Amino acid sequence: MVHFIFVTGGVVSSLGKGLTAASLAMLLQAKGFRVSVRKLDPYLNIDPGTMNPHEHGEVYVTDDGAETDLDLGHYERFTGVSACKFDSITTGAIYSKLLKDERLGNYAGVTVQVIPHVTNIIKDFILSNTKGVDFIICEIGGTVGDIEGLPFFEAIRQIGNQLKSENCLFIHLTLLPYVKTARELKIKPTQHSVKALRAIGISPNILVCRAERNISKGEIDKISLLCNIESEYVVPAIDQKNIYLVPIAYHNSGLDNKVLKFFNINIMPSKLDKWHDIINRLKDSNSKVRIAIIAKYHKLKDAYKSVIEALDHAGIYYKYKIDLVWINAENLTEENINKKLLDIDGILVPGGFGERATKGKIIAIKYARTNNIPFFGICFGMQLATIEIAQNLIGIKDAVTEEFKVDGTKIIEKINKNCEDSKITIENVKKTMRLGSYPCSLVAGTIAANAYKSLEINERHRHRYKFNNEFQNIFEKHGIVFSGFSKDEEIVEIIELPLLRWFVGVQFHPEFKSKPFEAHPLFIQFIKAAIEYNKCN
């Protein structure tokens, strides 16, 4: 029988529900259990694929092409289990299905309502695709009390009644704010959060309390008394310097064992060797390397969450701290770039869409190429690298991308040439996008092949434009190596400048497949080149 665990949050958003769910999943895995983690988001968008990063942060792409919440990235990185389209749902997707079914007459003429019709769809999502797992952990987005989240809370309340405590556990994450003038953690917000949760029929079984400092036994006992939860099931969640310290912190607080005890499951020893190795490597990371990220959303780090984590994974691999320098691409010019990129050991241009800030990114790519600084271009970053090379090395001064330039030499073109711009709407945008995992063939003896130690790989994609193959010969005459292609050889996947220290651009998103215990080979090689550059300078 599958055991269901629901992770909810209160007091404030962004408390770390995703990290809590991912950490618990990993800890249960370490005891030999098979775990699946899912995210239920209450917003009305069908998925985050067309949402502004300022609204949502990174769009995380799964192997099967689902555009999902960045929390699924945490789930994958912590557990090593690939997520899929069945691991994420939104209110928008639920209502889309409901209204389609209503128009098809599937409700047989009854009045369609939130209860039971919306809640039934939510319950079906939670209770389906359970084969081969022991635990399903469901993170409910938002906080208790949010009006848009009520159908989700009602659905999990019903599941709780249906499955009883033998197979259903509620974990509630709250904040204990520290008031410096009073020199104490305040419990009142947690009381109100638990009260609000109980008001909709859910009594938390485990209360996880986020705080910036240690929670005393007296404070835990007080929380237990006022929230009517046994003190044993009040779990501290103290701020950590690095997110990869969180799972072991939860293990040390006994969260995994408390879950097993609640379900009356025999407590087994945990195999946490690889996580202790990560912690030791983090402790031993005394040297640092400075990486500049040339970004459009330089103030919103969550827009590049997986890139940041993938860089950290490579840092863990080499026992180096990654010192990220965020550069606003919009303000980068030929005049200030020397000052902006002073003492930088590597330059990374991440993926993105749209014309804004592209000029600064191209200037940064030229700076990396002409100064032989390790460079890594991802997706749009690779496309801009080919434009920079065309303009400044080959001499095609009017080189452009078809994404936002009609006039000029189109170095970057649409994948689907039959799709007119007027047809690219929210309704059919996915039809024009190359999404999910695709195979890629590498050329032997190249930087990419040596990094992967294989000639056949699979990587995740999210793009609708590609390199124009008509220019392959002229690029090759100027020293550019095309080292990776799609299976049909229609799409250039990787470019290299082998005469430089390390200059690589990829059409895919390698950051989505990097793990703290298995850093991605391209990020490993990029950081290796940056470390060597640092030592030489």
From Swiss-Prot:
A cellular component term, taken from the record's GO annotations: cytoplasm
Catalytic activity: UTP + L-glutamine + ATP + H2O = CTP + L-glutamate + ADP + phosphate + 2 H(+); L-glutamine + H2O = L-glutamate + NH4(+); UTP + NH4(+) + ATP = CTP + ADP + phosphate + 2 H(+)
EC number: 6.3.4.2
Region (Amidoligase domain): 1-265
UniProt: CTP binding residues: S13, D146, I147, E148, K222
Binding residue positions for Mg(2+): D71, E139
Record InterPro entries: Class_I_gatase-like (IPR029062), CTP_synthase (IPR004468), CTP_synthase_N (IPR017456), GATASE (IPR017926), GATase1_CTP_Synthase (IPR033828), P-loop_NTPase (IPR027417)
Sample GO molecular function, one term: identical protein binding
Reported regulation of activity: Allosterically activated by GTP, when glutamine is the substrate; GTP has no effect on the reaction when ammonia is the substrate. The allosteric effector GTP functions by stabilizing the protein conformation that binds the tetrahedral intermediate(s) formed during glutamine hydrolysis. Inhibited by the product CTP, via allosteric rather than competitive inhibition.
Chain ranges of the Glutamine amidotransferase type-1 domain: 290-536
Keywords attached to this entry: ATP-binding, Glutamine amidotransferase, Ligase, Magnesium, Metal-binding, Nucleotide-binding, Pyrimidine biosynthesis
Residue sites binding L-glutamine per the record: G352, F380, G381, M382, Q383, E403, R464
Residues annotated as the enzyme's active site: C379 (nucleophile), H509, E511
Chain residues that bind UTP: S13, K222
Top-level enzyme category: ligase
Pathway: Pyrimidine metabolism; CTP biosynthesis via de novo pathway; CTP from UDP: step 2/2
GO BP of this protein: 'de novo' CTP biosynthetic process; pyrimidine nucleobase biosynthetic process
UniProt binding sites for ATP: S14, L15, G16, K17, G18, L19, D71
Alphabetized SUPFAM superfamilies for the sequence: Class I glutamine amidotransferase-like, P-loop containing nucleoside triphosphate hydrolases
Origin: domain of life: Bacteria
Function: Catalyzes the ATP-dependent amination of UTP to CTP with either L-glutamine or ammonia as the source of nitrogen. Regulates intracellular CTP levels through interactions with the four ribonucleotide triphosphates.
HAMAP family in UniProt: PyrG
Assembly: Homotetramer.
Family the entry assigns: Belongs to the CTP synthase family.
Anything else known: CTPSs have evolved a hybrid strategy for distinguishing between UTP and CTP. The overlapping regions of the product feedback inhibitory and substrate sites recognize a common feature in both compounds, the triphosphate moiety. To differentiate isosteric substrate and product pyrimidine rings, an additional pocket far from the expected kinase/ligase catalytic site, specifically recognizes the cytosine and ribose portions of the product inhibitor.
Protein name, as recorded: CTP synthase
Native source species: Rickettsia peacockii (strain Rustic)
Record gene name: pyrG
